[in-house]
Each structure stands twice: as structure tokens, then as C-alpha cells.
Amino acid sequence: EGITYMKSRAVAGDLERATRFLNRVQDVDWRRWGQSGRSRPQLAQMRLRLEKEQGAADPLTAGRGGYYDIDFALMFLRLKGAGIFFPVLNTPARIDVIEQMGHLDRSDADFLRDAATFYRAVDHGLRVSTGHAEGSLPTSDAQLETLAALVRRWTPDHLHNQPLDIELAPIQARTREFFNRLFGL
């Protein structure tokens, strides 16, 4: 519920008035969910349920250490600071704002930006190369090389120094370590 309210955006009419209203909604959201910490166990449960139900079929997104670990962590951190209205929703911008608020230290923020960039590049590369969303890396060497070439276009050099499967494993492990630390698991 709190997360849904935070995703609201002014799109028509008096944008200034709508933005003031959304600021007030997020202040209420913060008092109800962020300040009390009530969202922490609920978000952890939701995330682990998604992993159990979808993780095997979609390990890059829903699996252990997948993109959802980042997304749910950012949702929790955003709820902690929900009194501040976020004019943008993209992941790198959310990480930047949460870091500036003091809810992420520099090394965690840098890692989350890299991990999110890597996951999104792999996801987009899979969509471009196969024509649809895939939940895991391809098993064919030719498809894996095509995907790797696409990922190299969209990521900084340090995120594609090794084959994708070798690059992925430590990102997943560190993503889950961050998630567990944040949620006290």
C-alpha cells in the first residue's frame, strides 16, 4: 500500500498543486510505514515469497540475489525516507537520492548502481537478442556471446571483464548479502 502511493506522479492538470499533494501523501506514508519500521518484515516476506514462487523460472530477476533484491531494498530504504518526494523512479536515481539521504554508504550505493546496471543490461540484451524476456542466461554459446556483446555496449568496462556467467555469480552473492544485512536476515 505504501509503495503504491510512493509511485504516484503528477501527469496532468496543475502539476505544482499535485506535487504538493503528493508530498503530503508521502509524509503520511513515512509516518505510517517508514518511521515505524513496519514495512521491513513485510517487504522481506514478500521478497522471499517471490523468490520461492518465481526464482527457479526467473533467477536473474526473482532468484536469490537477483534484481528484486535490489528493488525491494530500495523500496524499504525509500519508505524510511518517504517524507521526501522523489520526482524520478529509475533505479540509478533512486540509489543516488537514498545515498544522499544517508541511508546508503558510498560503497553499497556504488555496488547497487553497478549491479542494477548489469541486471538491466542483461535483461535488455536478452529481449533484443531473443525477442522476449528470458529469466536466465542462454545455454547456447552463440546466444551467450551475442548477449555478452550487447551487455558490453551498455555497461562500464569493469562489469564485463569476464564471461557473463562468471561475472553474474559474485553480483548475485553480494546483492543477496546486502539484502540480508539490510533486512536483518
What are these regions (language model features)?
Residues 1-185:
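A nucleotide- and high-energy phosphate-metabolite-utilizing enzyme signature
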